[in-house]
């Protein structure tokens, strides 16, 4: 060898150094677009779920606290309107309370779907339970909407009088609760 030349000496790796290294046989794994899409849908689902829970809770509270008393001639003789005077409104309060409870309790499962977007089990369970609660919320809101319509307009064929001329505050609160329930139905569907 001459002065300017250098030579490389190869030293074999010990068995300790080789254990921690794996040979590179595959290319780097790219970003999975399907998982990103599912994560985005799950985030949107969580936002809608929280919105529906808020609307359902508001509808339940407003309907459950609705009452109005009208004095008639004296203080001892009064007309009183409460939500529980009509079984449809009682069904509304119970049904929307169940929907609210489910929507609040399903938020953690929705978060699991965000963290693990490819998990099929939690997503399927949410779809089935969401369908059941959407039907319950729709039936509660629809039946109450029919009674609110009768309260506003009456039915001359059945000789039912409109009561909203006398119980204006009661009718306004009940109408607001029904609108909030339909908002919850749209958000939870």
From Swiss-Prot:
UniProt keyword Transmembrane helix, yes or no: yes
Signal peptide: which range, if any? Answer: none
According to its UniProt record, which protein family does this protein belong to? Belongs to the Casparian strip membrane proteins (CASP) family.
User: Residues on the Cytoplasmic side?
Assistant: 1-42, 112-130
Tell me a GO biological process for this protein.
cell wall organization
Which InterPro entries does the UniProt entry name for this protein?
CASP/CASPL, CASP_dom, CASPL
Task: State its role.
Answer: Regulates membrane-cell wall junctions and localized cell wall deposition. Required for establishment of the Casparian strip membrane domain (CSD) and the subsequent formation of Casparian strips, a cell wall modification of the root endodermis that determines an apoplastic barrier between the intraorganismal apoplasm and the extraorganismal apoplasm and prevents lateral diffusion.
Topology class, membrane: Multi-pass membrane protein
**PANTHER family on file:** CASP-LIKE PROTEIN, CASP-LIKE PROTEIN 1U1
Q: GO terms for CC?
A: plasma membrane
The yes or no answer to whether the keyword Cell membrane is present is yes
What main location does UniProt list?
membrane
Query: Which of UniProt's keywords are assigned here?
Result: Cell membrane, Cell wall biogenesis/degradation, Membrane, Transmembrane, Transmembrane helix
- Looking at the record's lineage, which domain of life comes first? Eukaryota
- Report the source organism: Striga asiatica (Asiatic witchweed)
Which protein is depicted?
A: Casparian strip membrane protein 1
Family matches, as NCBIfam families: A_tha_TIGR01569
The cellular location(s) given in this protein's UniProt record come to:
Cell membrane
Q: Quaternary state and partners of this protein?
A: Homodimer and heterodimers.
What stretches pass through the bilayer?
43-63, 91-111, 131-151
Extracellular side of the membrane: what ranges?
64-90, 152-189
């Amino acid at each position: 060898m001459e002065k300017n030349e250098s030579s490389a000496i190869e030293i074999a790796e010990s068995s300790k150094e080789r254990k921690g290294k794996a040979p590179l046989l595959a290319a780097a794994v790219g970003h999975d677009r399907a998982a990103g899409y599912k994560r985005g849908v799950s985030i949107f689902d969580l936002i809608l779920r929280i919105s529906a829970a808020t609307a359902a809770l508001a509808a339940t509270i407003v309907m459950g606290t609705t009452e109005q008393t009208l004095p008639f001639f004296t203080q001892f003789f009064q007309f009183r309107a409460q939500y529980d005077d009509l079984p449809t409104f009682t069904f509304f309060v119970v049904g929307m309370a169940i929907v609210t409870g489910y929507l609040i309790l399903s938020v953690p499962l929705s978060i699991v779907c965000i963290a693990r977007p490819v998990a099929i089990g939690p997503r399927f369970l949410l779809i089935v339970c969401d369908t059941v609660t959407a039907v319950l919320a729709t039936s509660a809101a629809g039946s109450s909407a029919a009674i609110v319509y009768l309260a506003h307009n009456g039915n001359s064929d059945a000789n039912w009088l409109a009561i909203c001329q006398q119980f204006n505050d009661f009718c306004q609160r009940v109408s607001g609760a029904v609108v909030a329930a339909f908002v919850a139905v749209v958000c939870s569907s």
